[in-house]
């Protein structure tokens, strides 16, 4: 079979298109807010990572516009060469203070952070240890490092210790999601930090979904547990609570200096553009000044979770405003997603191999700016469609 033959044989997406159940690359015609314009009508958005509701905030947009006026639309180079602006440095200082580390380094995307950090820190004689449900960027970054990759069962501390014990004579890096992006549960950081210390492993937390959601004023998972000093590296993204695009890693000054000079994803990629840098900086300011957003996010989480539980939905181990509704087979998830959008709710289907076969789910995520009426309206629709598809009892 020729290299391109597999392209002609790739039918999965087209088969879904043929039966009008393709739920990817959907075109939204408005800003990402609690409601969006989709296929010509306003529907409730329960599929966005805009946790604090800041992507369309006037102050964040004004900061981006001012940055374009001063610096232009791009940096025309990598951070390593001509692409570092004074606002990059200012943002890095703000991020380091936010997560309680000495120094931070900004990348153009969150995915690139994990690629760059893992491939620069670990090598062929090292071991990277990951949770089975860690984000794809962690898996790809670990592969790029050429280190041996060991997986442990999801949030299973006994299994993690078995892996660590079997690798006690090697250099080890544990990397774990602070908040797991599909399940919505939180890493068992108290136990993980103890095991990392016991077995001499470096510990990195991917806090893409933790910053803005957990900790004092949204400072993240490590802050939430009071374990910032026990975590060597904290990674985060700007495409969720911080209303933009990009990512960062924060840690000891010498470690960040090392990554600066060896992370190919940083050195050979164009710098994060001025508008994005300024919008993140403004979003951090708003997040720290307006704690009501954090409180509202968790109040909305409690309401939605109660409605789902009362209706009989299986929400798995979720502990955060990422709430999965387990529906079973992949095709059921596709059907439910389509029916919900028809009825006025935008959600995301998560199917195998992202989850195990038979455990497909509808991934629901909340914003601080959702109103009680919007949540109740969306939940009424969820219950209606769930009963139609025999996911919950009638």
Say what each PLM segment does.
Residues 233-235, 242-291:
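Conserved core segment of the aminotransferase class I/II
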Residues 150-205:
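Active-site phosphate-binding strand-loop segment of PLP-dependent enzymes
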Residues 117-136:
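Conserved PLP-anchoring active-site segment centered on the Schiff-base-forming lysine
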Residues 62, 66-109:
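Conserved N-terminal alpha-helix of the aminotransferase class I/II PLP-enzyme fold
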Residues 295-304, 309-343, 354, 359, ...:
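Conserved PLP-binding catalytic core of the aspartate aminotransferase-like
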Residues 200, 207, 220-238, 257-261:
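Conserved active-site segment immediately N-terminal to the catalytic lysine
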Residues 58, 62-66, 70, 97, ...:
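PLP-dependent enzyme catalytic core of the Aspartate aminotransferase-like
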Residues 8-73, 201:
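N-terminal "arm"/small-domain region of PLP-dependent enzymes with the aminotransferase-like
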């Amino acid at each position: 079979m020729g290299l391109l033959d597999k392209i002609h044989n790739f039918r999965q997406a087209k088969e879904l298109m043929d039966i009008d159940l393709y739920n990817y690359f959907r075109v939204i015609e408005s800003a990402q807010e609690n409601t969006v314009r989709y296929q010509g009508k306003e529907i409730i958005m329960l599929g966005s990572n805009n946790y604090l509701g800041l992507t369309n905030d006037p102050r964040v947009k004004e900061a981006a516009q001012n940055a374009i006026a001063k610096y232009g639309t791009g940096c025309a180079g990598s951070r390593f060469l001509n692409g570092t602006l004074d606002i990059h440095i200012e943002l890095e200082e703000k991020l380091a203070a936010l997560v309680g580390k000495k120094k931070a380094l900004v990348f153009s995307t969150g995915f690139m952070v994990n690629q760059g950090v893992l491939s620069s820190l670990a090598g062929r004689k090292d071991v990277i240890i990951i949770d089975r449900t860690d984000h794809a960027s962690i898996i790809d970054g670990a592969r790029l490092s050429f280190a041996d990759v060991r997986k442990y069962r999801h949030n299973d501390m006994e299994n993690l210790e078995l892996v660590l014990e079997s690798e006690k004579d090697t250099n080890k890096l544990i990397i774990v999601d602070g908040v797991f992006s599909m399940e919505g549960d939180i890493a068992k950081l108290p136990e993980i930090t103890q095991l990392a210390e016991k077995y001499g492993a470096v510990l990195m937390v991917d806090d893409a979904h933790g910053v803005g959601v957990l900790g004092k004023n949204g400072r993240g998972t490590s802050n939430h547990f009071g374990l910032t000093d026990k975590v060597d590296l904290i990674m985060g993204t700007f495409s969720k609570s911080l209303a933009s695009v990009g990512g960062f890693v924060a840690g000891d000054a010498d470690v960040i200096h090392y990554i600066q000079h060896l992370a190919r994803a940083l050195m050979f990629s164009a710098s994060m553009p001025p508008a994005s840098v300024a919008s993140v900086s403004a979003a951090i300011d708003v997040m720290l000044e307006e704690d009501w957003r954090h409180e509202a996010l968790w109040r909305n989480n409690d309401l939605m979770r109660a409605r789902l539980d009362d209706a009989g939905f299986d929400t798995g181990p979720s502990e955060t405003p990422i709430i999965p509704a387990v529906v079973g087979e992949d095709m059921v998830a596709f059907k439910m997603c389509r029916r919900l959008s028809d009825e006025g709710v935008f959600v995301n289907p998560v199917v195998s191999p992202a989850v195990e076969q038979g455990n497909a789910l509808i991934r629901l995520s909340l914003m601080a700016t959702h109103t009680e009426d919007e949540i109740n309206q969306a939940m009424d629709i969820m219950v209606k469609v769930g009963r139609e598809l025999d996911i919950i009892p009638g």
